[in-house]
């Protein structure tokens, strides 16, 4: 027999969701009602945490991993899910995984945001992981608004929609034994749920519904970045294997606010940030791409030297890209760079500039994804 949890206080694990959230929910309910999922993605919202707050905008059914109904959650109340032995605990329920399914086209609450779709909570490591199970097209309403600027021309937002759809599908098809397809960060694609949905992103996603970039009949690895600094890169020059559709091309991103940038460091500050070399005496690129992007850097200090990768360099020095030059003067190192991101695939600011000049999204995509074709998704996508 099922039981419905009401607003009674269950220790500190039950709380009333913010009343203002109803304004957001009503607005998006009027804009578009969710449709039944055709391709469902698994988005990791929280991974291996000690507790995660979950809820629903409407009454919701709680099921175990086998689909058995365990009970119901009352609308607009949040519960904390946490580890219980080898299971997940949520109020009086306990199972290896729990699924929350809103009724009447409701939305799910995970930690501090509203999302479309359903919630799955699983036991992982010493904690629990919360996944948002969401339709691919509805996922894109949020991603396009988080990755691009909603006020951009529709053709730029359409290009972003196709790129993000293709990337998500590629990740889903290659996720293997992972329990999720994508997360919410720049490691995959930024995803903020209803918070980053806009009328313009809905329009762009719907106008390109089901369209992807493909090569040999398969979704491509449709990576993108903010600004290349004038020219994108061949993928093998920055990462590993060559791909026929990720080729370096002229970029049109000169309007980007991140097209040029600079940072200054003292020799002592660099030594502290890099560690193990003492006061820095020189920074010398040991490997660069044909367009000048640093892939490997030699740092020499008064106590030793170190060879670091482009990824480490960006993280340690918080650089927008590794396309830069270095000049030293009286113990100060000036780094003058261009662009923001890895410089491979679609340039978002380049797409903006082209769209602003009247170029259509299909031509934008053809420029940045050489040799790839704009096609329709196949009706069934195997996991």
Segments from the language model and where they lie:
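Conserved, single-site charged/polar hotspot
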Residues: 2-383
């Amino acid at each position: 027999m099922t039981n419905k949890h009401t607003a009674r206080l269950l220790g500190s694990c039950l709380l009333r969701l913010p009343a203002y959230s109803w304004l957001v929910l009503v607005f998006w309910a009027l804009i578009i009602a969710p449709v039944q999922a055709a391709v469902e993605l698994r988005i990791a919202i929280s991974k291996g945490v000690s507790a995660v707050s979950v809820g629903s905008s409407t009454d919701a059914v709680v099921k175990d991993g086998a689909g058995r109904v365990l009970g119901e959650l009352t609308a607009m109340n949040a519960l904390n899910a946490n580890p219980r032995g080898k299971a997940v605990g949520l109020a009086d329920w306990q199972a290896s995984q729990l699924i929350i399914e809103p009724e009447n086209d409701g939305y799910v609450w995970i930690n501090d945001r509203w999302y479309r779709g359903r919630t799955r909570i699983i036991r992982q490591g010493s904690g629990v992981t919360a996944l948002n199970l969401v339709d691919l097209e509805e996922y894109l309403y949020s991603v396009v608004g988080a990755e691009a600027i909603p006020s951009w021309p529709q053709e730029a937002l359409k290009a972003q929609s196709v790129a993000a759809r293709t990337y998500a599908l590629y990740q889903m098809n290659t996720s293997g034994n992972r329990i999720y397809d994508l997360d919410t960060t720049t490691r995959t694609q930024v995803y903020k749920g209803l918070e980053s949905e806009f009328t313009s992103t809905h329009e762009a996603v719907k106008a390109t519904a089901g369209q992807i970039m493909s090569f040999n009949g398969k979704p491509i690895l449709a990576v993108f970045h903010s600004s290349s600094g004038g020219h994108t890169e061949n993928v093998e020059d920055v990462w590993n294997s060559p791909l026929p559709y990720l080729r370096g091309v002229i970029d049109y991103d000169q309007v980007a606010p991140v097209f040029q940038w600079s940072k200054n460091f003292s020799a002592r500050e660099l030594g502290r940030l890099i560690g193990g070399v003492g006061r820095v005496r020189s920074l010398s690129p040991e490997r660069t791409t044909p367009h000048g992007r640093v892939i490997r850097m030699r740092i020499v200090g008064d106590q030793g030297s170190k060879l670091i990768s482009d990824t480490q360099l960006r993280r340690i020095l918080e650089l927008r890209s590794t396309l830069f030059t270095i000049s030293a003067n009286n113990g100060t190192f000036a780094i003058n760079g261009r662009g923001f991101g890895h410089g491979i695939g679609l340039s978002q600011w380049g797409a903006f500039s082209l769209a602003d000049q009247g170029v259509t999204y299909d031509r934008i995509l053809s420029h940045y994804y050489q040799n790839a074709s704009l096609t329709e998704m196949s009706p069934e996508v195997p996991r």
